[in-house]
């Protein structure tokens, strides 16, 4: 199963450098804290609509593959992050199977828990980079994060109802 927002997320084209944009836009796109928390600060109840979750092979993650270790399988999670039931963000997380050891096994068991609620409670979370992307008037970003030094890639597309616009 797929969703049009995930198709658009995969079509994002990334800037080589951070573009000169309005400071309010950059505040959203370069946020280092949890997007879930930011949405909740808007006075909204945040929920997850699951689109797809499970193991995939390299051929299903061509956009992410150059940014992650080459492995036989990856855990893929595609969701819509909703505020008061309205989709504000499409998210795609790709986790190499080698990352799924120890406490990070919990990444497979998030269910309808927003990823940010898990990631940003970890004292071992670091971020390698944030890249800003755009497609058909919508903004997005991707980040390679690390838990205990182990990588995962998170891509987010801000949907039209998001307060980013």
From Swiss-Prot:
InterPro entries hit by this protein: Chorismate--pyruvate_lyase, Chorismate_lyase_/UTRA_dom_sf
UniProt name for this protein: Chorismate pyruvate-lyase
One BP annotation, GO: ubiquinone biosynthetic process
Chief place of localization: cytoplasm
Entry EC no(s): 4.1.3.40
Pathway entry: Cofactor biosynthesis; ubiquinone biosynthesis
PANTHER family reported in the protein's UniProt record: CHORISMATE PYRUVATE-LYASE
Top-level taxon of the source organism: Bacteria
Subunit details: Monomer.
The keyword Iron belongs to this UniProt entry's keyword annotation: no
Cited function: Removes the pyruvyl group from chorismate, with concomitant aromatization of the ring, to provide 4-hydroxybenzoate (4HB) for the ubiquinone pathway.
GO molecular function, one term: chorismate lyase activity
Family under the similarity heading: Belongs to the UbiC family.
Pfam families the UniProt entry points to: Chor_lyase
EC class of the enzyme, as a word: lyase
Keywords: Cytoplasm, Lyase, Pyruvate, Ubiquinone biosynthesis
UniProt xrefs under SUPFAM superfamilies: Chorismate lyase-like (SSF64288)
